[in-house]
Amino acid sequence: MSEDRQGRSTDTGKILYCSFCGKSQHEVRKLIAGPSVFICDECVELCNDIIREELEEKAQSARSSLPKPREILEVLDQYVIGQNRAKRTLAVAVYNHYKRIESRQKNDDVELAKSNILLVGPTGSGKTLLAETLARLLNVPFTMADATTLTEAGYVGEDVENIIQKLLQKCDYDVEKAQQGIVYIDEIDKISRKSENPSITRDVSGEGVQQALLKLIEGTVASVPPQGGRKHPQQEFLQVDTKNILFICGGAFAGLDKVIQARSTDVGSIGFGAKVKSSERKQEVGKVLAEVEPEDLIKFGLIPEFVGRLPVVATLEELDEPALIKILTEPKNAITKQFKKLFEMENVELEFRPDALSAIARKALKRKTGARGLRTIVESVLLDTMYDLPSQENVSKVVVDESVIEHKSEPYLIYQTPAAPEQKAAGAE
């Protein structure tokens, strides 16, 4: 006997039955044949309903697990000091991004546009830490890329596709997970073109990289080799859709404040109605950056198409001395807490006096390294102590004060007083 693909018997008198529900070919509209089995249209519809319900349940659980903007902000506050405006902007943008993914799964009529994020702020102000904390909170794959190493395809350097390669490595090549991850591209200001006008020569690490990043950030299907590189052309490439990957770009944008100030004071610069530019009105860099407009970024050297694909702009302020002291002591993984833990493992208490914390903050401000330089300073003043301590006995406490930071004095070591030997009771032999 032979059957066609619809399950109709080519031999008369032979009735076929659905292998799942047992109904005959006369009781259903369609019977589909498989290898030695049949399935009717009713069972197919039932299977579709089951799958649809499971997908809806999965979407609901994802929605319930997605933290609200206020909850995101509370977690960011535990790790990042200050920068309240930037944290609020990020919390809302990330929440809306993952709501957008949910709406795409439902096939809603209204398609929500992708909102990638641009972080603008001085070095050491917390841009990278914000992105890392977000990824940890949302439990999604996260990778970082350095824009200065990227070049156009075909030139020496990293291709932009390598960014997706790194993201895949973070989630063990699970394409579904990678397609909902977060990518942080640092030093994005370093790929600005050299002048505001389009270049007639090839700029493979500046404007060329911006052009290469356009489709990746907006949403495209990137072909990525499973094991990286192009050494094995016979390998089957993985197809990764980037339309649901959140891209966060960050940069210090040194000199952008001058571009903004030039724009804001450019109106009426000649004649009786001219605004007088006073040198006394020197604003803080952070406050100036908060007034950034897309036109300022274009004038700085980003191409208009690239700026258009980063609609959410969050600016970070320069950290002052009180903020740096808080960074040293308050976050969950504060630097002083980390070193105290290291000393605790040697059964030694570590104390930082308030004047020492102020001195560390002042030194970081002087070096213009922001929060990133705090660890370097603490590491350098405690290096010799950490070298000698494991070999020393009876040390109970190490104290760091201002003189240790400012004058490179040795930290104070407090020793345990040896216990007095027990005296024998009177009359004992």
From Swiss-Prot:
It comes from the Bacteria. Residues 6-59 form the ClpX-type ZB domain. One of its GO terms (cellular component) is HslUV protease complex. Zn(2+) binds at residues 18, 21, 40, 43. InterPro entries: AAA+_ATPase (IPR003593), ATP-dep_Clp_protease_ClpX (IPR050052), ATPase_AAA_core (IPR003959), Clp_ATPase_C (IPR019489), Clp_protease_ATP-bd_su_ClpX (IPR004487), ClpX_bact (IPR046425), P-loop_NTPase (IPR027417), Znf_CppX_C4 (IPR010603). Pfam families: AAA_2, ClpB_D2-small, zf-C4_ClpX. One of its GO terms (biological process) is cell division. One of its GO terms (molecular function) is ATP-dependent protein folding chaperone. ATP binds at residues 122-129. Keywords: ATP-binding, Chaperone, Metal-binding, Nucleotide-binding, Zinc. Belongs to the ClpX chaperone family. ATP-dependent specificity component of the Clp protease. It directs the protease to specific substrates. Can perform chaperone functions in the absence of ClpP. Component of the ClpX-ClpP complex. Forms a hexameric ring that, in the presence of ATP, binds to fourteen ClpP subunits assembled into a disk-like structure with a central cavity, resembling the structure of eukaryotic proteasomes. NCBIfam families: clpX (TIGR00382), PRK05342.1 (NF003745). This is ATP-dependent Clp protease ATP-binding subunit ClpX. It comes from Stenotrophomonas maltophilia (strain K279a). The lineage of its organism: Bacteria, Pseudomonadati, Pseudomonadota, Gammaproteobacteria, Lysobacterales. The gene is clpX.
